Amino acid sequence: MINSLLTRVFGSRNERQLRQLNRLVTQINALEPTIEKLSDAELQAKTPEFKQRLAAGESLDKILPEAFAVCREASRRVLGMRHYDVQLIGGMVLHLGKIAEMRTGEGKTLVATLPVYLNALQGEGVHVVTVNDYLARRDAAQMGKLYNWLGLSVGVVYPGMPHSDKREAYGADITYGTNNEFGFDYLRDNMALSRADRYQRNLHYAIVDEVDSILIDEARTPLIISGPADESPELYIRVNRIVPQLTRQESEEGEGDFWIDEKGKQVHLSEAGMGHAEELLLQAGILENAEDGLYAAQNLSVVHHLNAALRAHAIYQRDVDYIVRDGEVVIVDEFTGRTLSGRRWSDGLHQAVEAKEGVPVQRENQTLASITFQNLFRMYKKLSGMTGTADTEAYEFQSIYGLEVVVIPTNRPTVRKDHPDQVFLNRKGKFNAVLADIEDCAKRGQPVLVGTTSIETSEMLSEHLRKAGVKHEVLNAKQHEREATIVANAGQPGAVTIATNMAGRGTDIVLGGSLESEYHALGEDASEDARFKIKTEWQRRHDAVKAAGGLHIIGTERHESRRIDNQLRGRAGRQGDPGSSRFYLSLEDNLMRIFASDWVQKAMRMMGMKEDDVIEDRLVSRQIEKAQRKVEAHNFDIRKNLLDFDDVNNDQRKVIYAQRDELLDAESVKDNVDGIRGDVIYDLVARFVPPNSVDEQWDLKGLEATLESELGMTLSLTDMVRAQEEIDAEQIAAKVQTAVDAHFAEKEAAIGADTMRALEKHVMLTVLDQGWKEHLAKMDYLRQGIYLRGYAQKQPKQEYKKEAFELFSEMLENVKREVINLLARVRIRSEEEVAELEEQERLQAQARLMASQFQHQDVGGYGAEEEVEQMQGGNAPVPVSQVTRDEPKVGRNDPCPCGSGKKYKHCHGQLS
């Protein structure tokens, strides 16, 4: 009550921020008359002037009003577009490192030019992040005219571009690209074997377009670079033949072999199902011993394959979750409806789906490098974003990324009419009503956009409309090549467009059709008369559509997130245009069936409802919203859980990547090698001759054999001990150390100091990369089974942290030992041989990258649902990580970032 009273008196926090920013808008507008009088040359000269002022110590905030005024005037001259006052506010919000919520059609692309121009003046690079390559290239081409005119360079990065071009794009003042490309390039850079092979500079400032889609929807899935593992895909094909013989239970307690947990996208074998599966696997010769049972240690790989095959058959549907194209299984993005070519599900799921569809089964992949979007974007010194729908996820933006959401007012009031949901008993009744609404709109000349959640639904509706003789277009993963043309015409009078999840399409639907597309089709040489005719005809259509009610949005199903529904609605009513929306639902829809309360269904049936009867009631709408909130909370838990685990990996990733950077930058790593050699020899001797021990405890023969097998050195320690009457363990260790040092000195004298330095650096990098790759595989296995610790009354997250630390320490020790062993045994005659070795390794690394899969991991892996429940059950709350604005270098005497409490040099800085 006190809060609401204070809000009434002082306004909400959002209103107070807008008032504060309006003062800066007044300053910018006051500068406009002066800036307008400048010639083109004088306006362009402002860019070097701003750079000089920044170099002299002036802050970005100080020059903001003048820089925004210059950018606005340049935009008016170059693009023919002048920023509105609300767009200036949006630009300020982005500059301040916050999220600007701006409605569809309010010109987010133009808004971004203001903070991009201002921050690019620092010369450290600005990344503009989009959801797809088309938008990245389009925006770079359109807005690049403005930036180039103002004296700033622009680059765009996309998959498959030549190495030199990509380096140049990252070296530009402003770089456009997708979130995936920026993420994969970061991982590629940290697999590079020389500075020349790297693309990116420091991560300075990023503006993320459709920020909710990238930082929330896609944050459930890590970016992974993986290479083919050695295991044959044959087992997937054999297990696939067995799964169709298993039957589904209708309920958890019913008859059958397995039941489906639809919320968690999991399949669970029943008691009877385990027995039936074992029987079938024995008959097929996949299980060898009937006594061992399915869950014996040696059969865990079979369990993994069986679970993947069950999920592929029971949960993942063709033309909903994936399509089959040119003999390949291609994933369909559940949020945007786009195909994700080149991406693969992990945990064997993709191979299981390939086996199910009868297409060639690719080898399972081994992780080479991975990162989540949360940890990628938190590495930027400054991060901001824009979207039409962020306010519903404000808590997550604040708690995970430290980003505040500011809702920007529209330039003109929104007049769209959002009609209440209509709820039907079944899908047939719902689609009859949808088809009737579409036909009514088409007759009246009102354009209609129909949003569906799957390709299957869009094609079913298309078939019904074709039979009814209604002309229409379908926009889904199968027709994405024609996307621009379809969207350009979606606002024509009476146009009917069926689209799977319009979220993130990035192109406005203009009432009357796209005038810009018609001008483009005319060509640049078209006469003014021809352009005038086009404009007159477009205006007639535009007015006719407005009179018919503007664009009408039909939603055929509620999405699991309210935000996606709002994005669909937001396609209508842009910039004060008229428009309307309505959602048609049925009790058979996934959201209603899985999450809505049973009483809604019972009540509708008790009322004797028929399939064409409809309910429009606030109580039902509230139940639907409640169901959506449940799903949103569930998905937040999954993302938070993923982040808690990846934070452990991230601490280790930072240490490894920091050490790689030091190795790449170092002229010489001799001091590192000398230090490592001392540690390795001390540990080696201590295994056979423990410190402070007596000669009866020594194993000199074992030490001699190990020195020969691991270091290629022959030392007669037994004779040496016989020759000296009094010798202790410390003296033996010193003798071995001296002998090994001499062995390395001889090698260096033989091949030359420069050759030795190059060899040391090459070996350290290669061994570190191999060790990290093997460590990631171990971490994957640890992650998959850690939730089971919850059944032993242990906290899985704490257990994961503890074991991950032990694995990491073990990996570092193995790396140190392998470096010394290789350097001791390798035979090199000249520096040219080292250079040739490095070049071969570099080419092999590039070949591995070319053969690698770039994927989003499917987080609904075996046991993922149990993981979330186990992580939450009885665990102390984990402190929420705030956005890291700057990553200082870890000093040798600083506390290690892994949290052990030791100094960095005594913990994970041991390689440095």
From Swiss-Prot:
May bind 1 zinc ion per subunit. GO terms for cellular component: cell envelope Sec protein transport complex; cytosol; plasma membrane. ATP binds at Q87, G105, E106, G107, K108, T109, D508. CDD domains: DEXDc_SecA, SF2_C_secA. Its cofactor is Zn(2+). It is found in: Cell inner membrane; Cytoplasm. SUPFAM superfamilies: Helical scaffold and wing domains of SecA, P-loop containing nucleoside triphosphate hydrolases, Pre-protein crosslinking domain of SecA. This is Protein translocase subunit SecA. The gene is secA.
